[in-house]
């Protein structure tokens, strides 16, 4: 899986390694479905502190479209983990929903007599 990293934060090199490792780990079972992930970090209100670290994860999936999830937290790691966990749950839900539609579509075909 290809991980693209965008950030305007000062300690971006540490965050880049962390984001790539965490994204590959969280999506390890869905790599056949998610070929590319984009992780973007932004500090909403600058160096003032508070719950303002935003992580946006955009996943391009094969056949299900793209998934974009944003999480805001007090620190970068929590924001990254929150966004990745929500994104993986959403991709899994979309995959199951798509499989259900295909199964119902096959059952809807009338039998010939």
Locations of regions flagged by a protein language model:
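N-terminal, polar/charged subdomain of small-to-medium soluble alpha/beta proteins
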Residues: 1-113
